[in-house]
Amino acid sequence: KGFINAAGIESPGLSSAPAIAEMVTDIVKELLPLEKNPDFVGTRKGILRPDTLSLEERNKLIKEHPEYGNIICRCEMITEGEIMDAIHRPLGARSLDGVKRRTRAGMGRCQAGFCSPRTMEILEREVPMSMFDITKNGVGSNIVVGYNKEV
């Protein structure tokens, strides 16, 4: 009682997932008193891309938020503001690859050779976390492992 097993259901895959979710929702409604959250936002906003704005809109944005005028990744033209947005959003980026997947910073022709140190500085400041804790892509992929002449 109190456990709903939706794993291992023989189905055609993802196409039946919405129907299974509705079925589980109906079961939970019978077991618990549920009420709709009036503040629930069902969609998330994307990361603001200044390069998609008109010149006037971009200038206004930079005037209000100067970090959007600071280019971090020259190859992909990604700004500090975009990286900060990727870090501070729900389930925000916590690694270089996390920032890369959300913003494209590091996907250009230099493959993060120029922007990775600057992206790491932003992660260190905004998360906040130590340079030693910043990874390329999760546990075991630390980039900084010691100080110069110590390693």
Named regions from a protein language model:
Residues K100-S116, D133-V151:
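Short Fe-S-cluster ligation motifs
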Residues K36, L96, M129-K136:
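Short, surface-exposed acidic
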Residues T79-P90, G113-M131:
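Iron-sulfur (Fe-S) cluster-binding segments and ferredoxin-like electron-carrier domains
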